[in-house]
Amino acid sequence: MPVLVETIAEFKTGKPFQGMMVGFRLHLEPKTAVLIEALLAGGAEVIAMGNEGTTQFGTAEVLSSQGCEVLDRPGQGPEATAVHLSRVASTGPDLVLDNGAELIGACLDNASPPLGATEETTSGAFRLREDHAGQVGFPVIVINDSPLKSIVENKHGVGESVVDTIVRVTNMSFHKKRVVVYGYGWCGRGIALYAQRRGADVTVVEIDPIKALEAAMDGFDVAEPSVASTTAEVVITATGRPGVVDYPAIEQMPDGVLLANAGHVDTEIDIRQLEQQAPGAELSPSLKRHDLSNGKSVFSIAEGRIVNLAAFGGIGNPIEAMDLGLTLQARSLAALVDP
């Protein structure tokens, strides 16, 4: 990761975060560990938490040995997220590096608000601009708005790693598979592109008419959900919104359909309702079969969590893509301190 390593060298000399506490919420895996190394090199104290299902605990142990306080523990349940958010917010961080805007939200009631924050995701940008509109009294740099991140990390990094992870988890070929991609933002663009490169017949579902037009001009079929889902063999969500594919929609899908989510939130596909109605039988790590009451079978990956990180063996985006995106995070935090 040469760009981030160069940043680390600069931070060691300049110490932009000397004496500051950074609240860190991002997937904890080897690439993001280098970002934490950059913050520590810059003089920061770091208290870190990951996202449910994506923390690599070997990485967490290494970070702890380097002086970063890591809250995640093996075997923790979903309730740990709220506990950890509260714990990080209670330290009164000077800076926040967030992934989903939940940590920023937890800091809004602090007596001393952060100097500023960065937000990594589309989901977090939605939350800030909608749920927290007018409530955030400090600057937030949405890294996802950068064209550098959009093109390099979201389109090509996410697109390549999502399709590659699905192939490895299922051991199936994409050739002539009918793949439906929900969402044609930058991640959806990339997923559609890389699925097509693997030989899939791709249909895009997109509610924004301009993006839907772009998908059509890019050569993809565009259809309403009720039409696209009835022929799908693989469904991949990438919208950053909850409730995109509900259980009634799953019931209408063809027998043998595979469900995977590439968005930040694990509720884009209603896996919880699917599990209640048709508990999954584990076929292999991260892959389940659900036998519906209507006689159909549905397959799901990683319980609806972000597939390229939460699935067994998922290693996230290519290291070159993350080098650029994580450098944007580090340098954006430095810019908030010294604009």
Q: What is each model feature region?
A:
Residues 1-4, 21, 29, 138-176, ...:
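Adenosine-phosphate binding glycine-rich loop
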Residues 95-98, 111-125, 250-291, 299-300, ...:
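ADP-ribose/adenylate-binding Rossmann-like module
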Residues 1-17, 50-177:
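Glycine/serine-rich phosphate-binding loop and adjoining beta1-alpha1 elements at the start
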Residues 43-45, 68, 112-114, 136-138, ...:
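A short helix->loop->beta-strand "cap" motif at the edges of active sites that frequently abuts
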Residues 88-89, 227-228, 252:
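Structural alpha-helical scaffold elements that stabilize or flank donor/cofactor-binding regions
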Residues 6-9, 13-16, 37-40, 101-105, ...:
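Rossmann-fold NAD(P) dinucleotide-binding segment
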Residues 26-44, 49, 157-160, 164-242:
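Glycine-rich phosphate/diphosphate-binding loop of Rossmann-like nucleotide-binding domains
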